[in-house]
Amino acid sequence: MTPSPFRRIDQQLFAQVAAEARQHPRLRLNHNFHREQDAVQRFLNVLQPGTYVRPHRHRRNGSGTGFECFLVLQGAIGLLLFNGEGEIQQQLHLSAKGPTHGIEIAEDQFHTLVALEADSVIFELKQGPYQPAQDKDFLNGFPNEGTSEAARQEAQ
């Protein structure tokens, strides 16, 4: 059977991935449209309130030309931008209802996401290929995901 030349990004997909994210220990789940070796990563990231995304930045090729783009398709997300010392430089409210639906940030920008509504769905776009060992550079001073310290951090 030949694979379909298109993939729907619809409410049924949102509901399916959101249900899985609610059951996942991290309270979030990616649904990839790309293969790891693709030049462009394209995926849904579904976040539930209470998930902890350790502040990080991406340094894919060291050229400084990289980016990460977020577009909220359902729900609302808080995006926090940090400097290298871990101080919050900017807080943004991204929502499917607007007025700000998305943002593009440059590589080397430390950031984290906070789910402000249940079943929040964002479409993410960034350069590939995906290299798990090099994908994220975590900001010092913040706990690892899955620890009791992370749970306390998220509660704040």
Model-derived regions, located:
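A short, N-terminal "cap"/entry segment at the start of jelly-roll beta-barrel domains
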Residues: M1-L44, L92-S95
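Conserved short histidine dyad/triad with adjacent acidic residue
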Residues: R26-L27, N45-G64
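His/acidic/aromatic-lined binding-pocket segments of jelly-roll/cupin-type domains
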Residues: F43-N45, G62-V72, I103, L113-V114
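Glycine- and acidic-residue-biased ligand/ion/polar-headgroup-sensing regions
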Residues: Q48, G66-G84
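Short beta-strand His + acidic residue motifs that chelate non-heme Fe in jelly-roll/DSBH
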Residues: P55, L79-L81, I103-I105, H111-L116, ...
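Short acidic-glycine-tyrosine-enriched beta hairpin
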Residues: N83-H111
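Double-stranded beta-helix
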Residues: E87, T112-Q156
